Amino acid sequence: MIHAHSNARLLRWAILAIAPVTLGACAPNGPPGLPYPDGKPLIPINTAAPEQGSSCQTRAP
């Protein structure tokens, strides 16, 4: 259980660290706290990474 809890904390930290960057790069007009203009959830980081690459063309692959 401790391992899962630490993973959740790490995931939350990563989201908090990545969200502002995604906000600035992808959704300058989007509301604060939502990295995607579509309002997609922040939690699935596995989907967030590939989507970030495809929707944010400001970052080089």
Swiss-Prot record:
Residues 37-61 are annotated as: Disordered. Residues 1-25 form the signal peptide. Residues 52-61 have a biased composition (Polar residues). Coiled coil: none annotated. Keywords: Signal, Transport. Induction: Cotranscribed with ptxABCDE. Activated by the two-component regulatory system BvgS/BvgA. Forms a complex with PtlF. Component of the type IV secretion system ptl required for secretion of assembled pertussis toxin (PTX) through the outer membrane. This is Type IV secretion system protein PtlI.
